Each structure stands twice: as C-alpha cells, then as structure tokens.
Amino acid sequence: MERGRERGLGQWVSRTFWSTFRNSRQVERALNRVLKPLAVGQRGLNVGAGERRAHQALITVDLDRSLAIDCVADAKRLPFQDRAFAVVLSQEALEHVPDPFQAVREMGRVLNRSGRLLLQVPFVLGYHPDPEDFWRFTAAGLRGLFEQAGLQCEQVEVAYGAGTGLHRILVEFGAGVVERLFAPAYRPAKGCLAIMFYPLKWLDGWLAKRDSNRIAGGFIGIGTKPA
C-alpha cells in the first residue's frame, strides 16, 4: 500500500511539474487552431497518444497494448486508408520512433487534402526511453520533417522556452549528483528538484522575446497537405 501511494505521488509530480504537454500558450494556441475541424463532425488522429486525449473526436494510436487507447499500431504503418482524417497530431512521441521521417510520411498519407498535421517535439530533454529514445529536433529539423513528407510548413515556434530547458538540465544534473551519492534516492530527488526549480518555467514567455531557442524545451509546428 505504501508503494502504491509513492507511485501515485510520483505520477502526480511527473504530470504536474515535468511531463506537461499543454501548459504553454503556444501549445494551447496551436492545438485550438488545428482541432477546429473536429467541432463540425470531422475525424482526427492522435499518433503516439499514450493515455492523453486532446479531443473526444480523436482516434488515439499507440504501440503500448497496456494503455487505454483506440488502436494499437506502429506509427510507420498506420492501419488507415489514404486521406481518412481532417486532423493528425503527434505530441512528444517522434523522438521514440526509429524512423520519424517515415512516420511523418504515414501521417501525411492518412491526412485529407488541405488537412493539418501538428507535430510537437522536445529539444532540451534528458534521455527517456519509452521503450527507446532516439532523436531531438531543432526548429529547422521540424520544418524538414514536414517538407520531406510533402507537406507545406505553416509555422514552427518554440513550444517550451529556455526556462523549461534550464529546468530540465538542472533537475537531471541534480538528480544525477544525488544518485552518485545514494542511488535509491534518484527518483525522490528528481521529484523534489522538479518542484524546486519549477518557477524557472515561468521565464519562458519573457525569454521568448529573445533568441532563446538555443536551449528551448521543445518546438511545435503545423503542416498542411496541399489541396
């Protein structure tokens, strides 16, 4: 029972202070823009969704059979017809795909003409296998993902700024020092440090006025399929 409470506390810390996907204005704005067609009855797809459901009209896809998802499938071989969806999105999942270029081409294949693809990718983020962790993308790299899939890149911007990037670096570094001294304390230390340094994330908006993408936490972009 004690272990169960610790897992619950750890999950709360992770979701509240670490693994957040929609807690920035840029992410909220991009999602609201892309998800508008779903309000008029069109279908959408969320690739690598985990148990996150950004909208009730989105079909969720993931490789993990243990999750509460709609479809178990590989992002590189989506089991859907061409032009089946008005909207496709993938948030902080492509870094776990061995061939993200093929995965984005597949997302483009199942997208309607004039449909939109939203991609959110991490930049400054520690190694986090799920089950593996292969890639990090710059803003230019994200544009390249859209272009190689034959999509028109509408926009790419910072999803989480330099404050989040610094938060992640300090948390990982501090937890690593603690682990070197006493290995079992790594996860508790990481949770405490995530809370302690959380105010750094509040600097994202202020730093966005400067050339802060060198240590941005991540990027978000929207691509459109030609009509």
Where are these regions (language model features)?
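Conserved N-terminal segment of class I S-adenosyl-L-methionine
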Residues: M1-L78, R83, V87-Q91, F101-V104, ...
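S-adenosyl-L-methionine-dependent methyltransferase catalytic module, highlighting the catalytic core
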Residues: F21-R25, F101-Q102, E106, N112, ...
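Residues that form or flank phosphate/diphosphate-binding pockets in enzymes
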Residues: H55, P98, P129
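Short catalytic micro-motifs in class I SAM-dependent methyltransferases
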Residues: E92-H96
